Amino acid sequence: MPLIVLKDIRKSYTMGDGKIEILHGINLSIDKGEFVALMGPSGSGKSTMMNILGCLDKPTAGTYILDGEDTGNLTDSQLARIRNRKIGFVFQSFNLLPKTSALENVELPLIYAGIPNPERRLRAMEALKLVGLHDRMYHEPTQLSGGQQQRVAIARGIVNRAPILMAD
């Protein structure tokens, strides 16, 4: 069974009196373990598609089935739960909390998932070690280079061991 199935996904926005259709009937199936890249010129709908795939936005029409569950009728809190358990995110701007250590930044998704502190701390430390930052885990983002901040964001994206990792 595919991990992600999109059927006739459409997304449009109303701007003034007009309607702008960004996504036009997208069909897609992604199996667990598959690596997929969305490519296209600026303004082609990549970010819109990523927001839908990441359950950050809903399509205007069509069906999105994530791990066997139709996301179309889910509430915002149900979508948040799915994001926390099934999707790891690495944002282009990293979205690190400025006055928080690398370790605490990586722990955030685990806090939302209700993972108790001893396990949470250990998993965050393991994720930072995987990205080569075990020696910088107590540094705040301003004390890290851009590349190190990016690796903190990657560690935060993988710490929940979600089946999907989305990177922008």
Q: What spans do the regions from the language model cover?
A:
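ABC family nucleotide-binding domain
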Residues: P2-A167
